[in-house]
Amino acid sequence: MTSSGVLCLLGALSLQVLLLQPPGAQGAPNPDNSHSSSPAPPQTAQHLSQKSLKRETLKPAAHLVGDPSVQDSIHWRANTDHAFLRHGFSLSNNSLLVPTSGLYFVYSQVVFSGASCSEITPTLLYLSHEVLLFSSKYQVHVPLLSAQKSVCSGTQGPWMRSVYQGAVFLLTQGDRLSTYTDGVSHLLQSPSSVFFGAFAL
């Protein structure tokens, strides 16, 4: 073979080797990566938690319990015995102040108890518990939830009656929620028996 033939053979082999190499190795840009950016840094648990917190809407909520040291009325309190005020709710003059307008589930429970009923004069004992709304729309206390119980009609010995109420209401910012109870002297004052609250839906 002549020297010119050897040179032609070497050139053909070199071209074949170049064609077999990936585009990046040939000095040409890779069409698949020409517009790709550098890989994003790994996200830490803290970053993910912050993003989740931003996405989550923090809704107002409140849960109050009765003060067992007050016997002649229900004195609501927060920040004790699993009671709390969150995300705008406040407690003023024994009333819950609604922070924002919207739908709320309002609830309350009381438990009445007594040692016995009089055998001589077994008159009925009426018990009631209400959740009241005071709003700029009405300027009076309007009952939202109301329930009544009666005892001692032929009943002897210790007795107990529980009242739980709850429903959804459309409330306005600035509305005040309070309670009224008839038969306070018979209340079983404990955090798990006497409570009052609301939370936004």
Curated annotation (Swiss-Prot):
PROSITE patterns reported in the protein's UniProt record: THD_1 (PS00251), THD_2 (PS50049)
Subcellular localization, as worded in the UniProt entry: Secreted; Membrane
GO molecular function: cytokine activity; tumor necrosis factor receptor binding
Coiled coil: none
Keyword Membrane: yes
Top-level lineage group: Eukaryota
Keywords: Cytokine, Disulfide bond, Glycoprotein, Membrane, Secreted, Signal
Cited Pfam families: TNF
Positions of disulphide bridges: 117-152
Sugar attachment sites: 93
Annotated InterPro entries: TNF, TNF_beta, TNF_CS, TNF_dom, Tumour_necrosis_fac-like_dom
Positions of region (Disordered): 23-52
Signal peptide: 1-27
The keyword Cell division is annotated on this UniProt entry: no
Function: Cytokine that in its homotrimeric form binds to TNFRSF1A/TNFR1, TNFRSF1B/TNFBR and TNFRSF14/HVEM. In its heterotrimeric form with LTB binds to TNFRSF3/LTBR. Lymphotoxin is produced by lymphocytes and is cytotoxic for a wide range of tumor cells in vitro and in vivo.
UniProt protein name: Lymphotoxin-alpha
